[in-house]
Amino acid sequence: MFTLKQVINKSIQTSMKNGVMSSAVKRSFSTVGGINQPKSRKELSESFLDGTSSTYVEDMFANWVKDPKSVHPSWASFFESSERGVPAGEAFMSPPTLGSSVATKATPSTYTSSGSPKQVSDSMRLLLLVRAYQVRGHALANLDPLGLEVKEEPAEFNPAKYGFTEADMDRPIFVGEGFISGFLTNKQPETTLRQVLKRLKETYCGDIGIEYMHIQDREMCDWIRDKFETSQPVEIPDKEKIKILERLSWADQFEGFLGLKYRATRRFGLDGCESLIPGMKAMIDTATEDGVESIVLGMPHRGRLNVLANVVRKPLPAIFNEFNGGVISIEGEYSATGDVKYHLGTSYDRVTSSGKKVHLSLVANPSHLEAVNPLVEGKVRAKQHYSKDTEQKKSMAVQLHGDASVAGQGVVYETLHLSNLDNYSTGGTVHIVVNNQIGFTTNPKYSRSSKYCTDVAKTIDIPVFHVNGDNVEAVVKVCKIAAEWRQKFKRDVFVDIVCYRKHGHNETDQPKFTQPIMYDKIGKQQPIIEKYSNKLIAEKVITQEQYLQMKNIIHESYEKGYQDGMKHVPNAEDWLESRWEGFKSPIELGNPGRTGIDQDLLQKIGKVLYTEPSGFEVHSTIKRLLKEKKDMFDKGTGFDWATAEALAFGSLLLDGNHVRLSGQDVERGTFSHRHAVWHDQKTDQTYAPLTKLATALGKKDAAEFVASNSSLSEFAVLGFELGYSLENPDALILWEAQFGDFSNGAQVIIDQFISSGEQKWMRQSGLTMLLPHGYDGAGPEHSSCRIERYLQLCDSDPNKIPPKEEAERKQSQHCNMQVLNCSTPVNYFHALRRQVHRDFRKPLVIATPKYLLRYEKSFSTAKEFSNDSFTRLYPEAFPDQINKPEKINRIVFCTGQVYYNLIASRESNNIKDVAIIRVEQLHPFPFDLVAEQLQHYPNAKAIWCQEEPMNMGYWNYIYPYFISTFKHINRPADITYTGRPSSASPAVASHTLHKLQLENFLSNALTGQVGSK
C-alpha cells in the first residue's frame, strides 16, 4: 500500500504523460504570502499535494488504507481513483459553482455509484478555507492592545473565493466522522460553513496569532493544530484564574511600589507588559512538571527587576538595598566595581505551586542587547553535560528579547543557528519577546524590513505564537504550550507578547517627543490589572473584597522588603554557585599547582595518541604523522605543538577535568596540525584518540573530551563557550579562532564579558582563547589577532610593582585576564594545565603560532614536560655562544615567533654582543623577571623588538612597564623600539615587501643599523 503522496505522485505522472499537468501541482498557493484562488478542478485537488496543506486529507487517507469503509464513499472513490493513477486533477468533478469556465468531464473510472463528487468538492473547498486561516489567520489576529494598525481581511478568507455563497453558510457539508483531529473532532460526519468559520476566527484571529505552517515536519504541525483547533474554546478553571490574577497583581504592584519609592530612578519597568510575569511563571510550572530541574534565563533591562523579584524570587531586601545604593564590601569580600541594578544576575532555588523544586539562574549581562544569548545556551549545555542529561529534559534555556533587538541584532540569528548542531544544541529554547512596538524612539517600520520582529524564527523551522499582552489568559496559554513544545520536540519556540511601554525608554524619558499618537493612546489605556480583575469580578470568580485583600497582602510584603532592605548586608557568596565553593577571590592568595607530568604518564598518553585503531582506514598523511609521533616518544625529542597540546588535554582528562575545544575547523586545525579527530577514508566514521584514554588506561573517573567544529560564527560561538565555562571551574574550555584576525567578530563578548565580567558581576571564568597570530607574509587579513587590543583591556597598573616574593601569585589573582605568546610547545602545555591546576580562574588569551607549528627548532623534549610550572620569561637560551654578560651591548626583549627570526639573524651574522630574551607572559607583566635580566646585563642597551607595526602589537603596552622596572632597579629609563613602522593596515600584501621589512627591523634590533633598502 502506498502513502498518499506516492498515490498522488503516481496520478501526477499520468497527468504529465497526458499533457494535462497543472502548474498548481508545483504550488497552488504560498504557505507564507497568501493563497491564490484555484482556477480549475485540477488545481483544487492538487492544492493538497503541498507539504502541510494535505493535513486533513492525509488523515482520511490513512484511515481509508486501514478500512475503506471508514471514510465516506465519495472520499473512498477519490482515493481509489488516485491510487489507480487517474490524473490528480481528474479524480473528482467540481460542481459548476467552482471553475465553471473549465470543462469538467470525468472519466467513467473516476466514480462509483455510492460516491458523490460534490461532497468531495465541498470538503476540499472547505479544507482549503481552513488552511487559509491556518497559514494567514495571524494577519487578522487582534494582537495590538493599542489598536495602532488598521487591518484588512485577507482576500483568501472570503468564502466566495472557494465557490461558496451565502446560501451555503448553513448547508451541511460532509467532513467525515471521528477520524480527523482539529476542528472536526465533534464526532459529527457533517458541519456547516458558519460553524467552521466561527471557530476559525476564534482560534486564528482572536488574541493569539499562530505561525506554524512554514514548518516542514508534519508531526509538529499536527501537534500545534491539535493544541489550538479544539472543537470548542477551552475554559480555564476558576482556581487557575485566581492564580493568574495574583501573579499579575504581584507584577503590577512591584512597578507601582518602585515608582512610588524611587520616582527619579531608572528601573526600565514592565508597565504595559505585566502579563509577562504570570506567563513566565506558568511556563516554568509547566516545564517543571515535565521534568525540568534547572532553567537559565537571559534577558535585557526591560522588566528585569520584576523578573528577578517575582519569577526568580531574588529576596526583596536585596533588590531594595541595591536601589538604596548598597554595595558589597570591597575590602572584605571582593574587588568588584559592580553594575547597575538592571544588569545584575542571580541564582535561586524556587518551589513551584505543585511543590517541585527548580533552580533558576538569571545570567548577568551588559547593555549590549542580545549579547547574552549565546552565554545562556552555553551555560545550559554545560549543565546538561555535567548532569549527564543526554535527553536534554532537565535543563532548559529561556531567552527574553525586545522587539527591536530581536530583529536588529545579528547575534540572535547566530545563536539560533546553533540550536540544532550536535555539540551546541540545548534541546530547545523558549524565546519570549516583550514587544512594546518601539525601539527606544524608533518605530518598527524603521527598525525592521519584515512584518514581524520574530521572522528570524522561520529560518530554523520553529513556531511563533503572537499574543495580545492585555489578554493575560492568552499569554499564560501560549507560554504553557511553548514549554510543552520544547519538552516534546526539543526545538526552539517563540512567544511574541505584543504590548506597550507605559513610560519612555526609562522612567525619566519623555516619549511624546517622538511618539505623540502612540502615547496619547497609552495615556488612555486601562491597565491590564484593572481589565482582568474587573473581568473576574464580573464572572464572580472573585469578589471585590477578596481582590482588595489580595492587593493589601502584596503591598505589605513589598513594604516589609523595603524596610528590611535598609538593614540588608550584601554578600559575595550570594553570587557564587556551589560548584565554585572554595575558589579564591582576587584579593585572596591561592596556591599555584604543579603543571608538569611524570614521564611514565607522558608515555602512556603518547601511546594512545599514536596508535592506529584496527579496522580503521586513516589518511596516508596521518599514518605518516602517527609514525613521526611514535618516534618522538621513543626518542624523547621533537615534541611539536599539536603533541604538546594533546598531552595537556590528555593529562587533564585523566585528572578528571573536562576538556572542550570549539571553533571553526578545530578538529583538524586550520593549519592541518592538530588532527584531534580522524576520518575513516572508506566509511567516513570518526575516531578521536583522546576520547579513548579512559578505556586504554583503565581510568573510570577520566573526564570527557570534546573537539567540535563550530558554525562560521565568532560572536555566538565564543559567547557559547564563555557561558559553558561559567558553569563548572573543573574544566578547560577553549575557543580557537580560525585565524586570530577574525576574533574581532566577537569583540562584544571580549569587551563586555571576558575582560570585565569578573569585576562587574563577580563571575570567574577560565575560558581560554587560542588566536593564531604571526607575520608570515600572508597579508593584512591573516597576520594579526590584534593583540594590542587585548593588552589594552588588561587592568594592571604599570606603576605598581608587587613585592618580589608574591609577584606571580598576587599578580595572577589581581588581574582581570592573562595574555601570553608562547615560543615553545612545552610552555604552551604548561600554560594550558595552569588554567586548571590552581584555585582561581582567569580568562586566558594566547597568541598561538602558525609557521612554528612545523618549525623543528621550536620543538621541545620529553623531559621538559616534567618541569614544575609555566615559564613567564625565557632568559638567553645560548649564553655560551655570546659574550659574557658585562660585554653584552644590546639586550633584545621580544615575544612569540619573532624570537626565531632574531636567533637566525644573530647566528648568520655572527653577532656576539646581543642577548635575546623572550617574554612569554605579557599580562600580568613579569616585573621581577625583567628586572633580573636588566641587572644581569648591566651595560646593555634595552631594545623591544616586534614583528607588528609600531602602533600595534606590544610596544605601547609594554613601554610603561619597562619604564617602571628601570626606575625600580635605579637604572636610567631607556628602551628603544624596533619593528615595522606604524600602519593603518596590520600587514603588507606583498611577500617581497614583507621580507624586506623583516630584514630591516631584525638588523636594526641586533646592530642598530637598518638593513639593505
Curated annotation (Swiss-Prot):
Reaction catalysed by this enzyme: N(6)-[(R)-lipoyl]-L-lysyl-[protein] + 2-oxoglutarate + H(+) = N(6)-[(R)-S(8)-succinyldihydrolipoyl]-L-lysyl-[protein] + CO2
Enzyme Commission code(s) on record: 1.2.4.2
Keywords from the named record: Glycolysis, Magnesium, Metal-binding, Mitochondrion, Oxidoreductase, Thiamine pyrophosphate, Transit peptide
UniProt transit peptide range: 1-39
A Pfam family reported for this protein in Swiss-Prot or TrEMBL: E1_dh
A Gene Ontology BP annotation from the UniProt entry: glycolytic process
Essential cofactor(s): thiamine diphosphate; Mg(2+)
GO MF term set: metal ion binding; oxoglutarate dehydrogenase (succinyl-transferring) activity; thiamine pyrophosphate binding
Localization per record: Mitochondrion matrix
Positions contributing to thiamine diphosphate binding: R302, D403, N436, I438, Q664
CDD domains: TPP_E1_OGDC_like
A single cellular component GO annotation: mitochondrial matrix
Domain of life: Eukaryota
InterPro entries: 2-oxogl_dehyd_N, 2oxoglutarate_DH_E1, DH_E1, KGD_C_sf, ODO-1/KGD_C, THDP-binding, Transketolase-like_Pyr-bd
Residues noted as binding Mg(2+) in the record, renumbered to the chain: D403, N436, I438
Record family assignment: Belongs to the alpha-ketoglutarate dehydrogenase family.
Subunit-level organization: Homodimer. Component of the 2-oxoglutarate dehydrogenase complex.
Main function: The 2-oxoglutarate dehydrogenase complex catalyzes the overall conversion of 2-oxoglutarate to succinyl-CoA and CO(2). It contains multiple copies of three enzymatic components: 2-oxoglutarate dehydrogenase (E1), dihydrolipoamide succinyltransferase (E2) and lipoamide dehydrogenase (E3).
Protein name: 2-oxoglutarate dehydrogenase, mitochondrial
Organism: Dictyostelium discoideum
